[in-house]
Each structure stands twice: as structure tokens, then as C-alpha cells.
């Protein structure tokens, strides 16, 4: 029995979840998201909760049980609260700004980097050294944050680059004379 999959997903007030076969649709104050699950997983609504169960006792069904439950949980949480990833920029002259539908990054290259902001994602720069990526889809928020970080990841000697807010960079000592 899956320790995660056996727990039903509570649906908060203000969120409606529609189950149609293997497709789920959640509507909330932040928008609408849909999810399609594999055939080995059965989904149903019971007492205002989404219950996820394996259809068969095959290995594949058991492997995907908790995964499907977590995807449903993220779907419900996304339309109700949303997800946010914060990035920090360290380095002399390194900065970020939002111009129209682009995120403009100056990261020590000879040119500035223009990153087009995808649909469904909101990017804010409260300070030139902090970037906040938010949206309803957890996977898309994480992917956009990872793409921004990949432009110049943190280096281990001085810590310059783009890093996640709570990320710990293991520092190295420079060469000795």
C-alpha cells in the first residue's frame, strides 16, 4: 500500500474538480488546469475529496499510484494558491528587469539576455537582484526557474551567478601560493 497514494486529496472551498474518465479539470480563483492520468489509475470524487486508487495490482499501477495522487494535489493547490520560485542574482553588475513580455538579464556576458515570459507565468523583479517566478502549474514554474538559472549557474569560488533562494552553494578555496 502506498503511503502517499492512500490519502485522499481534499478539495478546498472555491475549487471545483471535475472527473471525466481519466481526465481531471480543476477550476479555482487563479484559473483552470487539466490533467490526464494513465489507464492504470482510477480517480473518483467522494465527500469533497479526490480519491486515487490503482485499477489493478500490477507493478506499473503501484509505481504510478502516489505519482498520480501528487499530480492531483498539485493541480488543486495550483488553482487555489499557486506556486512561486524565488531566484537570487549575485555578482557585480548582475541584474534583472522585466520589460514588457521579456525578462532582461545582465549576467556578465557581452550582451544582455532576453527571456520571453511564457503564457501562464508571472515574473516579478522587486529588486534588480531578485526574480520571483509564479504561476498555477508547478511543473511550468519550476521549468522556467531552471531555465533562468541555467543562463549562469552559481560558481563555487565567489558564488556569482543565479541561484534559488534557499540554495546552498558549496564554496571552494582558491589556489594557494
Curated annotation (Swiss-Prot):
Keywords: Ribonucleoprotein, Ribosomal protein, RNA-binding, rRNA-binding. Signal peptide: none annotated. InterPro entries: Ribosomal_uL6-like, Ribosomal_uL6-like_a/b-dom_sf, Ribosomal_uL6_a/b-dom, Ribosomal_uL6_bac-type, Ribosomal_uL6_CS. The keyword rRNA-binding applies. One of its GO terms (cellular component) is cytosolic large ribosomal subunit. GO terms for molecular function: rRNA binding; structural constituent of ribosome. It comes from the Bacteria. PROSITE patterns: RIBOSOMAL_L6_1. GO terms for biological process: cytoplasmic translation. The keyword Zinc-finger does not apply. This protein binds to the 23S rRNA, and is important in its secondary structure. It is located near the subunit interface in the base of the L7/L12 stalk, and near the tRNA binding site of the peptidyltransferase center. PANTHER family: 60S/50S RIBOSOMAL PROTEIN L6/L9, LARGE RIBOSOMAL SUBUNIT PROTEIN UL6M. Part of the 50S ribosomal subunit. Belongs to the universal ribosomal protein uL6 family. HAMAP family: Ribosomal_uL6_B. This is Large ribosomal subunit protein uL6.
